[in-house]
């Protein structure tokens, strides 16, 4: 799932994530390695927010609902719901394995990406000689299907051989990680055509 540029909402979510890192007492204006610390709290919060954007409401309802977390597997005593425990776990795991400055740079790069920034998207697409396959998922609210359709319509205006497919997938933006048989057949067919 993709779009010709990041939406205002995407940029807003990424800025909240970056700000959580910058506000971490261990961030030290990005020089945390000089202080032998890691801004884990900020990175954890950033990932928790980011992870929410990858999931659909349907998936979260089906997987977690409003179920309470059992006391044996609670990560801390302030947790009531399974979704809270899940996000805490995902945030902790990510904060132990990812660099905070890299996260800031990566999200800034995504925010600044714009296929038509320097000129009309049609001008940029004219440079493409390959055929395009755009796949989206109905449940993806981070990059909704209509954003991928923008790419395909611009490709068609430039006589670029393109295909656009929207698949069911209850997992939101993360749908590409599940039921890979659904889209692997589409990709194989596209490559062989």
Could you describe each region identified by the protein language model?
Residues 101-108, 185:
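Feature representing long, continuous alpha-helical segments
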Residues 89-90, 105-124:
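Active-site nucleophile elbow and catalytic-triad environment of alpha/beta-hydrolase enzymes
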Residues 125-129, 156-158:
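Short, conserved loop/helix-junction motifs that constitute active-site signature segments
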Residues 3, 138-140:
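Residue-level signal for short, function-critical loop segments
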């Amino acid at each position: 799932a993709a779009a010709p540029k990041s939406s205002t909402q995407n940029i807003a979510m990424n800025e909240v994530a970056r700000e959580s890192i910058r506000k971490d007492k261990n961030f030290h204006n990005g020089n945390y390695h000089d202080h032998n610390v890691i801004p884990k709290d900020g990175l954890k919060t950033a990932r928790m927010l980011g992870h929410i954007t990858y999931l659909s409401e349907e998936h979260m309802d089906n997987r977690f609902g409003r179920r309470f977390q059992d006391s044996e597997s609670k990560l801390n005593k302030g947790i009531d719901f399974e979704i809270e425990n899940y996000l805490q776990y995902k945030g902790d795991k990510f904060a132990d394995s990812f660099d905070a400055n890299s996260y800031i740079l990566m999200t800034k790069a995504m925010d600044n990406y714009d296929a038509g920034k320097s000129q009309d998207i049609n001008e940029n697409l004219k440079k493409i000689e390959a055929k395009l396959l755009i796949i989206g998922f109905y449940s993806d609210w981070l990059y909704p299907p209509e954003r991928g359709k923008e790419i395909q319509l611009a490709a068609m205006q430039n006589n670029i051989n393109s295909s656009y497919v929207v698949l069911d997938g209850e997992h939101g933006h993360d749908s590409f990680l599940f039921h890979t048989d659904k889209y692997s057949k589409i990709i194989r067919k596209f490559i062989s055509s």
